[in-house]
Design a protein with these regions (language model features):
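Non-catalytic interaction/regulatory segments
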Residues: 34-124
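Terminal appendage regions of diverse proteins
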Residues: 17-19, 27, 113, 117-193
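Short, well-ordered alpha-helical packing segments
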Residues: 3, 7-11, 49-53, 132
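Active/ligand-binding-proximal structured segments within catalytic/core domains
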Residues: 1-34
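Ordered, soluble secondary-structure elements with a strong preference for glycine-centered loop motifs
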Residues: 1, 38-46, 140-144
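Divalent metal-coordination and catalytic microenvironments
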Residues: 4-6, 32, 92, 104, ...
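Alpha-helical hydrophobic packing sites
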Residues: 2, 6, 106, 138, ...
Length: 193
């Protein structure tokens, strides 16, 4: 179900060309390959993720139609994957605006997904991008581990503003390197003279 919600958001945000090209799905992790030529910005990925989570929170019930003819499914506006082979009778799975032909397993309502977190976005071939994501408790565990790392950094750096503290450390390090190079040159110059 989460792949369907992601697919809908990709098409809404990137355009109708963003069609599914493959996927691997298990209960807490999935990867989703789709057609698109450019990397997706972090800001846009966050917006896509927010929209998928907003849909999850709406608790939209599964609307499933079985034994539907291909022509009836087309008439209903169900998304069909180009090049995919379908039987004469198909299953249409709908969650709100998302309506696709599908033979996969689905939740009874979107809220059963719990949480959706994009882990990565990358290129897998020319014109094909991949999003890897986690759902449910796996997504929660990932976010919790990240939160714990942030807390540990706050303790180590003695600040809540981790970015500023790291920038200060990097600048201090750069200044020390510059001073060190200057001292090495002076020392070498003194040895020669």
């Amino acid at each position: 179900t989460a792949t369907h919600l992601l697919h809908l958001e990709l098409r809404n945000m990137l355009g109708d060309h963003a069609m599914q090209k493959g996927s691997l799905v298990d209960e807490s992790y999935f990867r989703f390959d789709f057609s698109h030529h450019n990397a997706i910005s972090r800001d846009l990925l966050e917006k896509i993720e927010q929209n998928v989570n907003a849909t999850i929170l709406k608790n939209i019930l599964l609307n499933e139609k079985t034994n539907v003819s291909i022509s009836d499914a087309e008439e209903m506006g169900a998304l069909m994957l180009f090049g995919e082979k379908y039987d004469e009778k198909v299953r249409v799975v709908q969650f709100g605006e998302s309506k696709e032909l599908c033979g996969g397993t689905h939740v009874g309502s979107t809220s059963e997904i719990g949480l959706f977190k994009i882990v990565s976005e990358s290129s897998v071939a020319s014109g094909i991008r991949r999003i890897e994501a986690r759902t449910g408790i796996s997504a929660f565990n990932l976010l919790n581990a990240s939160y714990q790392k942030s807390r540990n950094l706050e303790t180590l750096l003695k600040t809540k503003d981790i970015s500023s503290a790291i920038n200060k450390l990097l600048n201090d390090n750069k200044n020390l390197e510059t001073k060190n190079q200057k001292l090495e040159k002076e020392s070498l110059s003194n040895l020669i003279n």
